[in-house]
Each structure stands twice: as structure tokens, then as C-alpha cells.
Amino acid sequence: MNKYTVMAAGLVLSLGLVAGCGSSDGAEAGKAPEKGASDAPKDAPKAGGPVYSGPAIPGLADKQAWSLPRADAIDLGDTFLFVKTGAGEYASGGGSKDDPLDGTTGLLHSTDQPGPVELEFRDVKTGAVRKTLKVTTERVAATTWRDGVPAFEVRSSSTTESDGLSAEGTTTTITVYGSDGAELGKAEHEGDTPFHVHEGHLIEQADQATLQLTPIGGGQPRKVTCGGLQASCSFDPRNKDIDGGSGHAPLITGKYTFHVNNGSTYETDPEELVMSDLATGKKVWSSADVTPPKGVELDDKGVRTSGSIRVLDVRDGRILTAWGAGAFLTDTWVTATYDLASGKQIGGSTRYAYEDFPGDTINTEGSSVFSPDHQLAAAATERGSTVWQLADGTEVWAQKEGEKAMTPLRFSPNGAVLYGTTEESDDTVLAVDARTKKVLVKDLPEDNVPLSARQSGYGYVSTDAGFFVFPAAG
């Protein structure tokens, strides 16, 4: 497991297993926000929060764009969502075991009992209030709608008491909203079994080898089953992957879904990742149908000696993969990109021995952190950070023997700066030039490591002093 994943989680995405949470507009969750909603006037004032007085942050402009008092927010693309409680204070997220690994907010608001809150939609660049929505809820959390569109979900629950013979029953209503506060879809979940909300679907464990994907807003459920004798598959909300033995991939990516074949220790064939059409189940791509990249060890029959494989990303007709290098090279991975239509490898490949950390609670072996523009990737190798180009696998730079090994955390909004930690800097972070490795700052407080706002290119930090938004450095 890679040490950087634990560090990233410590600095702070998906949704929790908490049932019986939600929102309601009036008495009914998911109801059109007629009385509880208001569109902000065109002359709505900008945010008037504190002035940032912390250290300069490499990768961000010197002057903040706007700020608020202490708060956390859900990034909805061009909008930030804040939750204001009945006491008038902004909610602070984090603390959920299922929060995203990238440090962004997953669970923003959660209480044992429903209560009134105000949802506040602010423009990322100016801080101006675009809309407010009053609801009564127990839970507000980040999610995604179809094709990865940023969204948030609210839940409400009701309990049917036993009549003396029947069992007590719980119904949870889940409503998903978009960045403009409009309802995208609603669903109900019966019982108290755990579930997740992802890509416009309810994700549930149907049995040991099967996940059930139920479209929110209507539609036939789809079952994703991993193959193999006594195969086991599960969904991890922290990185949105399907986990099947030594095979890992995004459960849903756009119009596709993945499952794992030979996902069992009882299988002799290596794990196979299969991508299928989400609507029809028709196979679109399989790792078994492409040639493993150079550097992957094969036996005398041409079969991979390691079953470890993962899909890191699918976009623009390309699939980024990571392959276990060999049966006895458990921490060494080879990364390669394939054309979806032809199955041919695009560009070269990278081969690195990754830093292993047994304390990891999530499987991210062979993973890297990506710049927001997906131009660069940074891997946590045995000698420290290595940066490489996603397009062709070309190495940009790598730490040398004798240097203090840096574990990469994330890139700046413009991709120009890489932030990371060393064993000697648990509470502070290094900031280095992503292209040259030049150290820009060696003691940035961990709370001041910025997150990247989707689409806008702005960066933001949430500290005890406030919530601060900055343009990217020019």
C-alpha cells in the first residue's frame, strides 16, 4: 500500500454508510424547494470574511479572492455549497471514515436528529451568494450525478413501528441536487442495510460477489458480479473503486462499469478487469484482450505471473492502467495507457517500486496523484517522489538516493506545484516545482495545503482562521 494515501487522508473523498439521514423541504424530503428556496438577487454582496494572514502558498496568488469565517464546503464545479446551521454557524465536514482520499469534503453535515439548516450556494470566483435553500435534514454529503457531474445528496428517514407482529421498518429518502440547487433525482431505500450514493445510483452489496446499482430517479437495477470460485467484490467509497481480489478499477466511469474476473485466491489465472456498458452490460474492453506493457513478467506460457492490476482512469477514449510487475515483485508496478477502440498501447510505460506502508486501510497500490489538468502524475516510490507525464509515460524527474524521500500529496490548481511530506515533516509540507523539483517552501502547515476547485482553477484552504479562496498563481 502507498504511504501517500494515508497522509492524504490525514490532511483532511465518498459517502458514508449512515442510514436514516436526509433532508426535507417542509415535511417531505426531495420536494421541490418552493418555499424553502430563494434565488440570490443580482446585486448580492460578495463574501466578507477575514483577511488571510497565513504563510504564502506556492501555486496560489498572493491575494485572496474572498473568504468566510471557519467553514468547509462541497465543491460543485463553479459553485461551493455551504451548510449553515440553526445557530447561524457554517458546518465543518470531515471525520467520516468514508471521506474521500483526496482531502475534499465528503460528509459536510450529519446529526442524530433532523434539524433545520440553510444550504448556501456561492460562486467559486467571487463568493457571491447565488441561491439559498432551507431544508430539514440529518445529512448533507458530496456525491456525483451521471457522467461524474458534481452533486450533493440529502437524506431523510422515517420509521414504521411494529404492530406487535411485524418488524419495525425504516425508509430512507435520498434526494440528489445539482450545483444550481435543482433536484436531479430521488430514490427510497427500505431497511437499515448500508448503501452508498455514486454517479446517480444507489450502490448496495447484493452478495459476496455482486454489487447492485439502482438508478436514482427510476430505471432497472443493474447487478455487477465478479467472476471466480468464491469471488469477492466490494465498493470502496473513499476512492470509488470496485475491489475484487488483486483487481481494482472505478466501479462506474461515465457510461461504463467495471467488474473483476478470476477475483479469488482459489483461481490460478490472473485477475482480469472487464469494462462493460452500464446500460446493456455488453463488454467494451478487457485487460485480457490487450498486451501487457514491457516490464510485466510473463511465464513460459505468456501468462502474467502477477494477478495484480488496476485501472487508474478512463477519459478521452483512453484507459490508464497499472500492472503488477511480477509474482515476487509485490511493490513494483508498470503503468501504461491503452486506446479504447483499438486496444493498442499509447506511448511508453513507467515502472516503479512503490513505497509500501502496511498501515494502509485502503488498496491504492500502483496509484499516483494527478495534476488537475491530467498532464502530470506523481508516484510514491521507494526513493521518494517521481513525476511523469500521463500522455506518454515520460519521466519528468525522480528523487535520487540520499535525498529525503518525499511522499506526494497533491498538485496545485494550475499543476505547477507538487506538495508532499517527508518522515521528518509530519506536521508540515514541502512545496516543490512540479517540473524541476526545486523546493519552493519546506515548512507549509498541513492546513494550508490547498485543494483545487473543479473547473474554475481556483484553490482554497480551510483553517481555524477561516475559509479562503485564491486564484491560481499567474
Enumerate the predicted regions with their spans:
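Blade-loop segments of beta-propeller domains
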Residues: D123-E161, T172, E183-G191
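Blade-level signature of beta-propeller repeat domains, shared across WD40, Kelch, NHL, RCC1
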Residues: R435-G474
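N-terminal low-complexity, Pro/Thr-rich disordered segments
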Residues: V18-A71, F82, G474
